[in-house]
């Protein structure tokens, strides 16, 4: 039993070293990075140029983004410990295809309580539940 436990710990440590190295090397800063939505409410989102993006701006803790066709703006508060509050949000009022997804997008943003980073990915959570996943744009 002791050998099995030691072997399991060694295998886990070896695997994590590569993961942590990748995560640190490819991690992007929360602020100043343009984030592209790739998953919303557990469903994959096809990345479309100029749609469903988000940028956290340092000046006055502002947030800017684009939904299906509307510009989204507002404020955010973030801590280094992963606490994140977004909103209230405002947006332009154009109508276009994809409005249901845009509504779900803004609701996910406003319900966010925490964030986590995984390599070039930004994960938004609401009370422990994954709400949205973004990938850093190059």
Question: Language-model segments: what does each one mean?
Answer:
Residues 1-14:
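Sec-dependent bacterial lipoprotein signal peptides
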Residues 16-138:
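Lipid interaction determinants
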